[in-house]
Amino acid sequence: MADTAPQPSKRKRERDPEEAEAPSTEEKEARVGNGTSAPVRLPFSGFRVKKVLRESARDKIIFLHGKVNEASGDGDGEDAIVILEKTPFQVDQVAQLLMGSPELQLQFSNDIYSTYHLFPPRQLSDVKTTVVYPATEKHLQKYLHQDLHLVRETGGDYKNITLPHLESQSLSIQWVYNILDKKAEADRIVFENPDPSDGFVLIPDLKWNQKQLDDLYLIAICHRRGIKSLRDLTPEHLPLLRNILREGQEAILQRYQVTGDRLRVYLHYLPSYYHLHVHFTALGFEAPGAGVERAHLLAEVIENLEQDPEHYQRRTLTFALRADDPLLTLLQEAQRS
């Protein structure tokens, strides 16, 4: 069973999902409002399933592509993506359920073992629902299952291939600036160091509902602009990185009573968006992107920069790309030539 997270006195709403679970920068930029506990409706009428883009029995999640608003006279309707995910259990609610007389159907019984289908009440049967609407072809491809391929990017590859490719894309991060400028999600900020050069904000990741600690997940977003990724880091950024590591761990300890040795603190490369940010997750949580091919522990990043000022400009970095990613083709062609 999951630990129960302490509930702050004025905690407001949470929302969602990264990688395949994450909203794109365009999606995040659009959500500048705050949530509400009042009943609401989906932002479209009807939903005719066209395709299951992806599903995972292990993660209890499914990604659906559908047509909406078909009855409103908009021709063939519009595309939308709906992501349905079972929410984690909460100890107090489950304990209360089992103390009562839950509705059960026996599936299997043998000696001391038995399996049932249990039909929970409404408060235990919620499904986290993420909507991407209107959805573009780019969104559909993003959530569609794709094979992954490992690539090894040299420092030269980054300067000559990856960076020009990124600069050719329209990768808006206005949603990040909205958070930093308190235009959106200000009520969700757990901690802030306001220093414009070496400060940051700490905010719960959208994948974490803050109702239990087993899947604790927060993001530190630096105030300083222009640091795109690990490749940009030099000793000039050590004060910022040390602040994020030390103050982020202290803030999480104070707020959630989780010590630093129970946290995984790391950066992604490649990141999902190009403004420096650091992930804080519960050590036992298998967070998306926490594998060795993408996660770089912040403590080791700091040590690498202390020992070699140009470590991340020189080092060959390994990461995975989807089969349909144009960058994969560019890097593979360069390595063959």
Curated annotation (Swiss-Prot):
Question: What is the name of the protein in this document?
Answer: m7GpppX diphosphatase
Modification Phosphoserine occurs at = 24, 101
The UniProt entry annotates the motif Histidine triad motif at 275-279
Cross-referenced Pfam families, in alphabetical order? DcpS (PF05652), DcpS_C (PF11969)
Q: Which residues does substrate bind?
A: 175, 185, 205, 207, 268-279
Indicate which residues form the motif nuclear localization signal (NLS).
10-13
**In chain numbering, where does the motif nuclear export sequence (NES) fall?**
142-154
**Enzymatic class:** hydrolase
The UniProt entry annotates the active site at: 277 (nucleophile)
Q: Which family does it belong to?
A: Belongs to the HIT family.
Free-text function comment from the UniProt entry: Decapping scavenger enzyme that catalyzes the cleavage of a residual cap structure following the degradation of mRNAs by the 3'->5' exosome-mediated mRNA decay pathway. Hydrolyzes cap analog structures like 7-methylguanosine nucleoside triphosphate (m7GpppG) with up to 10 nucleotide substrates (small capped oligoribonucleotides) and specifically releases 5'-phosphorylated RNA fragments and 7-methylguanosine monophosphate (m7GMP). Cleaves cap analog structures like tri-methyl guanosine nucleoside triphosphate (m3(2,2,7)GpppG) with very poor efficiency.
Q: Where in the cell is it found?
A: Cytoplasm; Nucleus
Q: Which GO terms describe its biological process?
A: deadenylation-dependent decapping of nuclear-transcribed mRNA; mRNA cis splicing, via spliceosome
Recount the known activity regulation: The hydrolytic product 7-methylguanosine diphosphate (m7GDP) efficiently inhibits the decapping scavenger activity and acts as a competitive inhibitor in vitro. Inhibited by 2,4-diaminoquinazoline.
Q: Please indicate which superkingdom the organism of origin belongs to.
A: Eukaryota
Name the chemical reaction catalysed here.
Answer: a 5'-end (N(7)-methyl 5'-triphosphoguanosine)-ribonucleoside in mRNA + H2O = N(7)-methyl-GMP + a 5'-end diphospho-ribonucleoside in mRNA + 2 H(+)
Q: Which EC numbers characterise this protein's activity in its record? A: 3.6.1.59
Q: Where does the protein principally reside?
A: cytoplasm
Annotated Gene Ontology cellular components are: cytoplasm; cytosol; mitochondrion; nucleoplasm; nucleus; P-body
Q: Can you quote the domain comment?
A: The C-terminal histidine triad (HIT) motif and the N-terminal domain are required for the decapping activity. The N-terminus is necessary but not sufficient for binding cap structures.
UniProt keyword list: Acetylation, Cytoplasm, Hydrolase, mRNA processing, mRNA splicing, Nucleus, Phosphoprotein
Q: Gene encoding this chain? A: DCPS
Its subunit composition reads: Homodimer. Associates with components of the exosome multienzyme ribonuclease complex, such as EXOSC3 and EXOSC4. Interacts with NDOR1.
Q: Does the keyword Nucleus apply?
A: yes
Which Gene Ontology molecular-function terms are recorded?
5'-(N(7)-methyl 5'-triphosphoguanosine)-[mRNA] diphosphatase activity; identical protein binding; RNA 7-methylguanosine cap binding
